[in-house]
């Protein structure tokens, strides 16, 4: 018995204790991933290329879309979006469902929220999207991304309702798509990581926090007045952000001009066809790359909605 207790299996000679944190293991034991800001250089994204699930949708309202889509044109625009990421040096991964998924799987950002230690899996608020999170969870596991939590119980949470202000602070919103129980689960996990969580409420008629507030740099944010939560703007200003407000509401509504993805400090990828807003961004020192997205917009989402952020350069502030 003594000889057995001295073996490595029982903690004896040769035992190798695991002393690194999960965060330290990412990129070695686990796949490369992690996010703690909305503006640092973008490294990897998760997309879903629209497939046969978009064919023949005669009643878009039944799928919470705005108008019928030309599926072929939507695919071409999505392919151009993916290529724009590759051209910017971003690694593009695809969800790759094994069977035809629900039509809204294209909006991957809603299905996950990335932290420095791995992903939180969402629980979409509508029955139309129920189960989409399974495909994203499976793909994240394939990529070696740690899954820290899946929203459970009667909680609902969509990834577009959480944003990083800085590595120490995150916003989590409640509203149409995220309820109090779901927000509390996300906030609890983030607080375990030492992150300060500022919970805000969204007004009626707003889909997600992402649609009201975007970050262009460590000290520059763009917001939609009368939609963005007051507490969110106050939190940003308290942390020395300049908060600019969109110049043209028509472009924000119909062109999804605020629904951009930040490629790096003051570099964004935005939808084409928004000349007033693009000029406004450029005047603020933001470099804008544009892609056509008007067909995908008919599904009630834009570039930000379609992009699951897997990895940004991690900041050690």
Spans of features found by a protein language model:
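The feature marks the mature, well-folded catalytic cores of soluble enzymes
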Residues: 1-317
